[in-house]
Curated annotation (Swiss-Prot):
Protein's job: Probably participates in a plant defense mechanism. Has moderate levels of cytotoxic activity, active against a human lymphoma cell line with an IC(50) of >30 uM.
Family named by the database record: Belongs to the cyclotide family. Moebius subfamily.
Post-translational modification summary for this protein: This is a cyclic peptide.
UniProt remark on domains: The presence of a 'disulfide through disulfide knot' structurally defines this protein as a knottin.
Keywords from the named record: Disulfide bond, Knottin, Plant defense
Disulfides per UniProt: 5-19, 9-21, 14-26
Domain of life: Eukaryota
Name this polypeptide is given: Cyclotide vibi-D
Gene Ontology BP annotations: defense response
Keyword set includes Ribosomal protein: no
InterPro entries for the chain: Cyclotide, Cyclotide_sf
Amino acid sequence: GLPVCGETCFGGRCNTPGCTCSYPICTRN
């Protein structure tokens, strides 16, 4: 949901475990 994973997902996916792409950033549920 809210916390940002410190990662962008312009490629469409996030490398950080537990993070999902909320374009253009990765967020943690």
